[in-house]
Swiss-Prot record:
GO cellular component: cytosol
Cited NCBIfam families: PRK00228.1-1
Gene3D superfamilies: VC0467-like (3.40.1740.10)
PANTHER family: UNCHARACTERIZED PROTEIN YQGE, UPF0301 PROTEIN YQGE
Pfam families (alphabetical): DUF179
Name of the molecule in the record: UPF0301 protein Smlt1098
InterPro entries: AlgH-like
Signal peptide range in chain numbering: none
Top-level taxon of origin: Bacteria
Family the UniProt entry places it in: Belongs to the UPF0301 (AlgH) family.
Species, as recorded: Stenotrophomonas maltophilia (strain K279a)
Length: 188
């Protein structure tokens, strides 16, 4: 009987210390879609070199909100680094949105950024440039190699916890202290 993969959408992937790839080391990825064809998510703890004000200006969207202009944009992953992805908690019908899970949504359309600039956007939002993608079976293979922990998605972690605490904070949600893990075993 074939094994049916379980969808990891609405879960966080937490990179284990043994994952040394420069893009994903110590990263936390929110999985937005996962099926037999692959998976797509965004990193939620990697700062980019851009502010939201710079991104909005590039798109000819103006705002007088200094806090919004200064907000850090995250590096969402190596796929489509020129595209914006907004993780948020607002169920309104934006032009291009996907329900990730209970109270978590992914929007890729301009209308959400325009609403944010007018002060009418979601109460909580994380803007990323780029996303992460896994081909069919690739994520499952990485999980079997112990590259990632899986943790149920947590809006408080995604929106409120400081970036530098998200990696350990996500693992601690399931009782794991990443600083106590080793990537070897054997006899003395």
């Amino acid at each position: 009987m074939p094994v049916t993969p379980t969808s990891l959408a609405d879960h966080l992937l937490v990179a284990l210390p043994s994952l040394l790839d420069a893009t994903f080391a110590r990263s936390v990825a929110l999985i937005c879609q996962h099926d037999e064809n692959g998976a797509m998510g965004v990193l939620v703890n990697q700062p980019s070199e851009y502010t939201l004000g710079e991104v909005l200006a590039q798109m000819d969207i103006t705002t007088g909100d200094g806090d919004l202009q200064a907000r850090m944009v995250l590096n969402g992953g190596p796929v489509h680094p020129e595209r914006g992805f907004v993780i948020h908690d607002d169920a309104r019908a934006w032009d291009s949105s996907l329900t990730v899970g209970d109270g978590l949504y992914l929007t890729t359309s301009r209308d959400i950024l325009e609403a944010m600039a007018r002060g009418e956007g979601p109460a909580n939002a994380v803007v990323t440039l780029g996303c992460a993608g896994w081909g069919a079976g690739q994520l499952e293979s990485e999980l079997s190699e112990n590259s990632w922990l899986t943790v149920p998605a947590d809006a408080e972690l995604v929106f409120q916890l400081p970036l530098e605490q998200r990696w350990q904070g996500a693992a601690s949600r399931i009782g794991v202290d990443l600083f106590r893990l080793t990537d070897y075993s054997g006899h003395v």
